[in-house]
Amino acid sequence: MAARIVFAGTPDFAVPGLDALVEAGVRPVAVFTQPDRPAGRGRRLTPPPVKRAAERHGLGVHQPERLGAEEAEQIRALAPDLMVVVAYGQILRRNVLDVPRFGCVNVHASLLPRWRGAAPIQRALLAGDEQTGVTLMQMDEGLDTGPMLARKATPISADETAGSLHDRLARIGADLLVAHLPEILAGAITPEPQPDDGVTYAAKLTNDESWLDPTEPAEQLERRVRALAPVPGARLQLGETPVRVLAARACAGRPEDRAGTVAAVGSGGIEVATGEGRLEITRLKPAGGREQTAADYLNGRRLVPGEPVQ
């Protein structure tokens, strides 16, 4: 396919889209991604995943702090037919949106207009949504407000985590992009305006939202654990030890349970009494320690029913 494509993306979610374009014979004339950032315990300067993927494919990489007037002219000089944007991390302004012949299209990890914004995967899990999907959208200057080109739905399973859903939606998005690219470049798709009904926003999760509140119902806490797994993990003070809860399930409680205490411990996990039912923790990571099963954790620490959890 002899098309001049500019690709813009940054995290792991965007890599399958870039890979799919190259595998389909569409080598972007340029890749834009965020600058290298300090990461990890040593705060070493680390390239974003899209940069590593682009270099693996031998593609030219640009890493501006923002897409300003100078960058818009750089893109214009590339004479692109289309700009493909996947989790780039910036809202594009009109001076960029108007440059490509067929504009800019975005791969978004929700069924728009539900969950516009930065954290659609986590918000869908927190809300207990039964399905989500990917929307291919013609970009405008708003926050995920542009008209839709295509959508693909997928169910959310009962044990879905943010990690597993992220990987599946990234693959769905890549396939959706490649499947509809010929129509987009032929001007053969009529964009469909997003409906006014059903609009919700997916703000980034705050630090406070990572804490589990044992006074909430167990089902709600389980959703929070899954929405924060595997990274960064839901936080909890288990007795005297702060931990990250990586896997848990809601189960039935007992009349004598006191919310915010350890209800039971055993080979299956650590059961915490909540506002409604119990939360059985099966995998966790203590502060400064390694990820482990609850059984392994109990082998090295004494935890008894009645201890406080907060």
UniProtKB/Swiss-Prot annotation:
Keywords: Protein biosynthesis, Transferase. CDD domains: FMT_core_Met-tRNA-FMT_N (cd08646), Met_tRNA_FMT_C (cd08704). (6S)-5,6,7,8-tetrahydrofolate binds at residues 110-113. One of its GO terms (molecular function) is methionyl-tRNA formyltransferase activity. The keyword Protein biosynthesis applies. It comes from the Bacteria. Its EC number is 2.1.2.9. It is an enzyme of class 2 (transferase). The keyword Transferase applies. SUPFAM superfamilies: FMT C-terminal domain-like, Formyltransferase. One of its GO terms (cellular component) is cytosol. InterPro entries: Fmt, Formyl_trans_C, Formyl_transf_N, Formyl_transf_N_sf, Formyl_transferase-like_C_sf, GART_AS, Met-tRNA-FMT_C, Met-tRNA-FMT_N. It catalyses: L-methionyl-tRNA(fMet) + (6R)-10-formyltetrahydrofolate = N-formyl-L-methionyl-tRNA(fMet) + (6S)-5,6,7,8-tetrahydrofolate + H(+). PANTHER family: METHIONYL-TRNA FORMYLTRANSFERASE (PTHR11138), METHIONYL-TRNA FORMYLTRANSFERASE, MITOCHONDRIAL (PTHR11138:SF5). Belongs to the Fmt family. Attaches a formyl group to the free amino group of methionyl-tRNA(fMet). The formyl group appears to play a dual role in the initiator identity of N-formylmethionyl-tRNA by promoting its recognition by IF2 and preventing the misappropriation of this tRNA by the elongation apparatus. This is Methionyl-tRNA formyltransferase. It comes from Halorhodospira halophila (strain DSM 244 / SL1) (Ectothiorhodospira halophila (strain DSM 244 / SL1)). The gene is fmt.
